[in-house]
Design a protein with these regions (language model features):
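Gly/Ala-rich beta-loop-alpha elbow adjacent to hydrolase catalytic centers
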Residues: 92, 96, 100
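Structured catalytic cores of enzymes that bind and process phosphorylated ligands/cofactors
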Residues: 71-72, 100-102
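Short stretches within intrinsically disordered, low-complexity N-terminal or propeptide regions
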Residues: 9, 110-111
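Helix-rich "cap/lid" substructures immediately adjacent to catalytic or cofactor-binding pockets
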Residues: 2-91
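Conserved small/polar residues in nucleotide/adenosyl-binding loops
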Residues: 104-109
Length: 116
């Protein structure tokens, strides 16, 4: 795909906003549905609904924000990977450090959603 080194940087809490996954749904509905459903089953609440319809006050709650941002990061990573992108470097800010470590070195995204 690219001949130059590419870095992927994952965001932390504070990057959330209502409708934050809409651009991903438009590009890869199947991928979004699969990962949003997995996250929802693990967490016990509808992650897709919260990402698309949740208000700013809902998304400020850490218990909502961090799993939602992580799930969107997983979907973004999978979409980039599907398109052939293989980054040379990954990094993250705050919560994004977990995303970077886990997604770059493992396929166990479910594990991080279970951390209490």
């Amino acid at each position: 795909m690219l001949n130059e080194p590419v870095a992927v940087v994952f965001p932390g809490q504070g990057s959330q906003k209502p409708g934050m996954a809409e651009h991903l749904v438009e590009r890869a509905l199947d991928l979004c549905a699969r990962w949003m459903d997995r996250a929802s089953a693990i967490l016990g609440w509808d992650v897709a609904r919260m990402c698309s319809e949740g208000g700013a006050s809902d998304l400020r709650r850490t218990s909502v924000t961090q799993p939602a941002v992580f799930t969107v990061s997983v979907i973004t990573w999978r979409l980039l990977h599907r398109s052939g992108l293989r980054p040379s470097f990954v990094a993250g800010h705050s919560l994004g450090e977990y995303s970077a470590c886990l997604l770059y070195t493992s396929d166990a995204a479910d594990d991080l959603l279970c951390v209490d």
